[in-house]
Amino acid sequence: MERVWPECTTRCRSLQHALDVISVVTRASEQHIKVFLSSYCCNAVTLKDDFGRNATHIAASCGKKNVLDWLITGKGVDLAVKDKESGWTALHRSIFYGHIDCALSLLKHGSNLYIQDKDGYTPLDLVMKDRPPHIVFKTSDPTELYTWGDNVNFTLGHGTQQSKHHPELVEMFPRSGVYIKQMVLCKFHSVFLSQKGQVYTCGHGQGGRLGHGDELTCLVPRLVEGLRGHPCTQVAGAKDHTVVLTEDGYVYTFGLNTFHQLGIQPPPPNSNVPRQIQAKTMKGKTVLGVAAGRFHTVLWTKDAVYTVGLNGGQLGYLQDPNGEKFVSCPRQVSALHHKDINITLVSASDGATVCVSERGDIYLLSEYQCKKLASKQLNLKKVLVSGGILEHKAAPEHLKENGGQPASVFALDQAGRVFCWKSPGSSLKQCWWVYGRQLFMSDVALNKNEIMFVTQDGEGFTGKWMLEKKKKENTISNIMCHSDSQNVYEKISMQKLPFVHRAVSVATDPSGCNFAVLQSDPKTSLFEVPSVSSSVFAEDFEKLLNEANETDSIHDVTFQVGTKIFPAHKYILALRCDFFSKLFSSGEINSLDFPEVHQKGEDAAGCDLFVIEKIPPELFSHVLQFIYSDTCDMLLQGHKPKLWHKEENENTIICNFQKMGFREDIEGKSAYEVYKNSRICAENEKQKGKTKQSKKTRSIGDETSPVKMLQNTAKKFGLSNLSSRLDGVRYENGRINVFHKKSENKLRFNQKKCSSHYDVMMKSEDGKEFHCHKCVLCARLEYFNSMLSSSWIEASCCSQLEMPIHSDVLQVILDYIYTDEVLTVKESANVEFVCNVLVIADQLLIVRLKEICEVTIAERITLKNAAELLEFAALYNADQLKLSCLQFVGLNMGALLEARSLDVLSDDVLKDLSEAYRKMIPSMNKRIITPYLDGPDISILQSEDIESLISVQDDIYSYQITQEATLKKSKAKPKKKQRKRLDSSGGYNLSDIIQSPTSTGFVKPEKTNSVESLQDLLTSDSEGSFVGASSPRDLQSPDLFPVFTHETKETICVERNRSSPPVANGAASTKMPIPTTSSPKAIPMSRITPSTSPNWVAMPCSPASPVTMDLRAIMELEENIQKCGAMPKLNAGGTKPGTHVMKLSQKQRKMMAMSSKESNNENKPAKVTVAPTTIKSPAKTWAAAFHLGENKSFRDLLLEEKQSVTSFPSLSSDVKKSKHTEELDPSELARRPSGTLNQEAKLKCDVPNQDNSNPWHLTLSKNNASSAPVTFTAIVEEEEKQEAALIRSREKPLALIQIEERAIQDLLLHYQAIDNPEEYITIERAAQIPMATPMWNKH
């Protein structure tokens, strides 16, 4: 498109321009958008429409990632700009519309992930709100524990004393498959309760507070063995002791007992193991809950509360008149002993205890009093207390006078509201969150400095009380806060916790130094789980048996049963059948066991051949089928077995024949008489044995049953399993009836057994050797079947088989091949190892093993490795794993975006992730920005600015069609021409030409006139044209089509029809297209009639003025000037446009000259065609010209060569002069011998930077006779140089090629050639010197 300077400046604020920009961004392609934004307006990237949206907002909303990157890197747009409608940045919009690839690009360029919109939502909040509605986080779900803090006393459970600034996963629990449901953090230790009721502790063990029976420090959580047999439901802890409640309602305590807080009688100083509290006051009572403070322990039942420990005012009792400071046995709080009272919640701190009844009454036990704080607070979910003031006289060595903090009580109801009471004397108030949006809580934790919250959406927050300021009277805020005296709020400022997105519970220690949050397992809602296909183990070996033949290289034993041959495999037979194991190990079998088997030499493949007699081949086939696949047709319901009567009939006939005998009494009798006598004898014998036969009828019927026959055969071979399974099978009405099906054993092989039958040895890349069996490898894997059963070198190699696989992975592959199971993979916790197995399984096409690996990896997906596994699955075509990873990433998008874990993904995978994420959210179907069609017309951009890219594709397509048409025409045309061939040993074959590689170009000829030239080449005289070629294969295959370059050459193709008569003038005109230029516009064609003289016409001209020359002279002159791209003319007939010139010897050129001279003497009209061609091949100095000179003898040529050697050095000056346009007389050019033309063309080809002046106004050359012929020695030298250049190019090292490729790519980036709408830049290797054409040598 012609560049139009914009009518605005860099401060343009035109609303119309903004609308046009947004319209183009919504509907145009990325390339067109860049062109439009660069040329339409000087301020196009920052203009905003009525809604405050700019080009960056719309590009992020439409998923135009390339445009977005171009705006950020090239235009430097501000990513923090918000729109007017919602206050959204480009990051908000990209996430809202589901374009995760754009969101990651924005994050990489510094976009703020925590910036809030008008409603207080950050981009992460949008992800959270888009979570599918079926995902609800519960404490009963599988969970993960995250902790952070100063970790001074090893209370976080990470195994180190290093502090954690952000929530980090406690990896001990996921590794052991433990899910936590409650955690308690104290100053010196932490307590964790699993969902199965097991208790884990870590921290400092002084005093036995960990319950492990010692006082050692535990860096990671350790199971309390004393409670292993007692499933627990609740835990509580304080600074020095721990309290545990079991499912049976029993309470166990352990730790220091300084203040008698353990409740054990008699009070010990401490307890290193859990001990049960056994108090007479609680006999028959079922404890529902426990709580603990530093100085006391609280237990409660349905209707009573019991406390024990130091009485500093928090136990709910009055001071003891006898001065007793400790309560050693649990004692009921009498102040809460009301009628019909039901205790639901209890909590304790160091200096206070709070209780909640079923009626909603809240009581505070502090300062020796029981205060009722509120009533009718129904549906409370949790209550907490912090602080409290103790009487320092109760423990002067531990308490300070006027020490402690005022008590604070927090209550959480089922609706997610939080109520607060602060001492002294205030009322219960609802908390008011100072945050951008409304929050509803699901859990709360309290310490002396702040409050920890978990919302119903899984978010985590920390809150602090806001200091009250003096408010002016009659202000709006004052009116809002005091409009209702009963609805006063407690303001709490909120700050969101990072990396918390699926929280269900939160905990903190009393001092606020360490924290813990319980999050739902990220795989909880994952339903795209890989599956493993059914096993094909038995089918593989049954296929091996069916495909075995006597000539393959896999079988190693053959059995001849009757007239049938059964190739088999010794390892499988010996492992599955004891009979064959003995047979192969000893070489012979005991005649008493099986007298019908004997060895009979070798088969056709040189394997052992055994003959088995007195067994039908069909029965033996069933036996082999069972051995190989652990089943056979006789065990299938409804099978119709064959009955084997043929052998019995044959035996009867033979027996009768033997009974007839050859006695002398039958001599001279007819056959009828002999037959009649034998029949009479047979009837007599039948009558005699009638009674005996009736007794054996039943046994004979059993013997003829195929099931019984197979069962007897199985017993002979020692197949007890087959025999026992046939007991549940009957043969009824010609079918198999299975009335009792016994359980089948899984078919498995053992690699280490039958070591005498090893025939393959594999060697891993780390040098470990594995002995294997060829038959098992070939049966299980097509990879080994193709390698070992064919004529590859591996099949006949006697040494070990080198496998580029590590020994650990190779062992897994072999275990799967032999057993169809991979316990090593299923039990492995190393995901990288399983991934390595999957890679090898993918390479060896082991589909089922790959599926097993996918299932194992999917079970081990975490937030840390999800992105890497997704990239891995996409790389190795693990489709099931990829679907699991895509859904996992989509369900945990917020956590992964905040952790920047998705930065490792490639662009293609990010595009797939964006599509999967949009499909996961149903509302994404409605979030589509409709293209604005009222903007400027961008069709001009498509037709002009991007025309070069489109025209190149069109040229390729159209010229391919032209090539196909030319080949079809060349096949049909030879029938019309006379073939003149003196010797069939030379020349080209048509098949060789058609099968030769063609060079594609960007030329669109109007008409292809090279067919005649092709036929002339095919039918040319082999002696005159290709003398010296021993066979057609020794010649280089011609390239029928030109090669593309940026330069455009012209070639004159002269075609003579040797058999057809002259054509009348004007009968057929030939189009002559002008050579193409860089401009896409077409140039009018000029015509020439066949009546044009075939000879060059010399026109009178003046040396002082340019002369209009004949077209043919101009074209030949242009050809000589640009001889680097000229065509060789093999004879007077036509030539091929753009063919690669082949190498001709001196004798060949001489014979060509002779044949061309004879053809030139014939006065026949010629058709002249000018075809535009583009050549990128080096010039050939021996290229023949159009007008060949007179024929000379070999002696004359030698004399001429000697003379030219002496005068050749003087050509340098002439070569320099040839850089400029020469003044050449066309008549003199026509009379000049061909050798001179060739020499001049050669010299001009070597001169770079020729002046491409107008060919219609060329001046004549004044010194056109100072040229010398090229010698034969120079031709040979140039041949050697070109051959050396070809060798250097062929032997160029790969490292150097890669460096060149890298340099090309760097240059393309430097000049911004990729997707550049303004200019088209290409970078290619430049050929330094001419190079010989590579040729294939036939060996």
Curated annotation (Swiss-Prot):
InterPro entries in UniProt: Ankyrin_rpt, Ankyrin_rpt-contain_sf, BTB/POZ_dom, RCC1/BLIP-II, Reg_chr_condens, Signaling_Regulatory_Domain, SKP1/BTB/POZ_sf
Organism placement in taxonomy: Eukaryota, Metazoa, Chordata, Craniata, Vertebrata
Species the sequence originates in: Xenopus laevis (African clawed frog)
A GO CC annotation given for this chain: nucleoplasm
Cellular localisation: Cytoplasm; Membrane
GO biological process, one term: release of sequestered calcium ion into cytosol
Keyword Glycoprotein: no
ANK repeats (start-end): 51-81, 86-115, 119-154
Keyword line: ANK repeat, Cytoplasm, Membrane, Repeat
The protein's name: Inhibitor of Bruton tyrosine kinase
Residue spans of biased composition, Basic and acidic residues class: 1214-1231
